[in-house]
Amino acid sequence: MFPLIEFCVSNLAQGSQEAKEKLDKDPNLDVMEYGCLSYCGKCMDSPFALVNGEFVSGENAEQLVERIYAFIEENEMF
């Protein structure tokens, strides 16, 4: 079982699309895209994803990817 990274389709246009594309290439991650993750207020502010159900955001796609990997490393479950 790999870490689950969930993206909101509405947030992809806010900058998380590039992060999703980078993470999709990592065979050690399960990357999913959903219609809405119910984080509407935060969704409009910055790129974000849920990592194993926990909210992780960044100022841009590059920072989001860095923070996702840092979160996974700090919270190793597998």
Curated annotation (Swiss-Prot):
Classification via Pfam families: DUF1450
Xref: InterPro entries: DUF1450, UPF0349
Superkingdom of the source species: Bacteria
Family: Belongs to the UPF0349 family.
NCBIfam families xref list: PRK13669.1 (NF010190)
HAMAP family: UPF0349
Name of protein: UPF0349 protein BPUM_2879
Annotated source species: Bacillus pumilus (strain SAFR-032)
